[in-house]
Structures are given as C-alpha cells and as structure tokens.
C-alpha cells in the first residue's frame, strides 16, 4: 500500500492511517532512521540508567550476602548444638555452678542472630552488666563473641550489626583479655 492512498477528503493527500518514520521528510541519498537509533537515550540519561543498574546490582549482592549469612547462621546453630551434646558431664556440672559457658553464650548469640539478624554493642553491654559480678562469665562472653566474629565470613559481618565487625581480627586484644582474666582469677 502506498503512502498516498485514496482518501475521502482528497486524492493527493496521504492517508492519516499511514505512519511516517519521522517528522522530517526523507530526501534522496539519506538513510532512514531505524527504530534502534531512535530509541537510544541521550548521553545524560544513559548515565542515569547505569546508576540504577549499579544500585540494582548492589541490592542483589546484599540479598545474596543475606542468604549466605542465614546459611552460615544455620550451620553455626547446628555446630553449637553438636558442641553442647559433646560436653562432658563434669563440664556441664561446672557450668551450672558458674552460669554461662563460652558455648552457652555462642548458642545465645547465634539464636539472636537467627531471630533478629543483629548483634549490637548495646546488647553486648547489657549482657556484660547482667553478668558483671562473675569475671569468668565476662571472659566467656567476650571469647564467645570473638569466636563468632571470626567464624562468620568477613564480607557478611557488616550485615550482623556493629558488634562482630568491631571484634573481627582483634586476636591480640583477646589474648590480652584472657591474660588479664587468668591473672585476676589466680
């Protein structure tokens, strides 16, 4: 069908149903603009699209990290349950007299991570205030949190709150705290 169709209003005018590729008239030697050329955004908008896709990629990476963290927490929970079962009866009776052991603190922290996905410094300070009279329990809590900080992969620590990232890699600090704990309990 040609562009100059028969029309009721006039013979020489083009039909309104005929769609032209662009508002400019085509001239001899000039190539038509393709739909791909027309749909390409200007340079300024192209940068915006990259920012949006980078943000989307970042969100996907965070979601992937959250899934891996949930898997790591489940694995830790299974490991803590196994450790609890392996404790000897002598250690269990000693822990009952003492209160909380390192394993018990780790179990508590892993449960908190599973439920709220956060271990914060304020939670840690509250736990320290509750067990303040017992130097050994305080040392057990610090040791448990340090072990957790080193068991969870480093790239996922930022998703767990502010406690574990601050404890990660502070091995020298833990050795110093353990020496202080031994010297005060002797």
Curated annotation (Swiss-Prot):
The keyword Cell inner membrane does not apply. Transmembrane segments: none annotated. Disulfide bonds: none annotated. Residues 1-15 have a biased composition (Polar residues). Residues 1-44 are annotated as: Disordered. Keywords: Host cytoplasmic vesicle, Host nucleus. InterPro entries: Paramyxovir_NSC. It is found in: Host nucleus; Host cytoplasmic vesicle. GO terms for cellular component: host cell cytoplasmic vesicle; host cell nucleus. Interacts with the phosphoprotein (via C-terminus); this interaction allows C to associate with the ribonucleocapsid. Belongs to the morbillivirus protein C family. Ribonucleocapsid-associated protein that interacts with the phosphoprotein (P), thereby increasing replication accuracy and processivity of the polymerase complex. This is Protein C. The gene is P/V/C.
């Amino acid at each position: 069908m040609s562009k100059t169709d028969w029309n009721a209003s006039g013979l020489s005018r083009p039909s309104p149903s005929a769609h032209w590729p662009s508002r400019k008239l085509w001239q001899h030697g000039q190539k038509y603009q393709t739909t791909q050329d027309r749909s390409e955004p200007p340079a300024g908008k192209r940068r915006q699209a990259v920012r949006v896709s980078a943000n989307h990629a970042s969100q996907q990476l965070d979601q992937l990290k959250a899934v891996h963290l949930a898997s790591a927490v489940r694995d830790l929970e299974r490991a803590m349950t196994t450790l609890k079962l392996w404790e000897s009866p002598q250690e269990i009776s000693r822990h009952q007299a003492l209160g909380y052991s390192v394993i018990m603190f780790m179990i508590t922290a892993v449960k908190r991570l599973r439920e709220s996905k956060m271990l914060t410094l304020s939670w840690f300070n509250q736990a320290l205030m509750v067990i303040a009279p017992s130097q050994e329990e305080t040392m057990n809590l610090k040791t448990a949190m340090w072990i957790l900080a080193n068991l969870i992969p480093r790239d996922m620590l930022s998703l767990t709150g502010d406690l574990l990232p601050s404890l990660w890699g502070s091995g020298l600090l833990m050795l110093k705290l353990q020496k202080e704990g031994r010297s005060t309990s002797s």
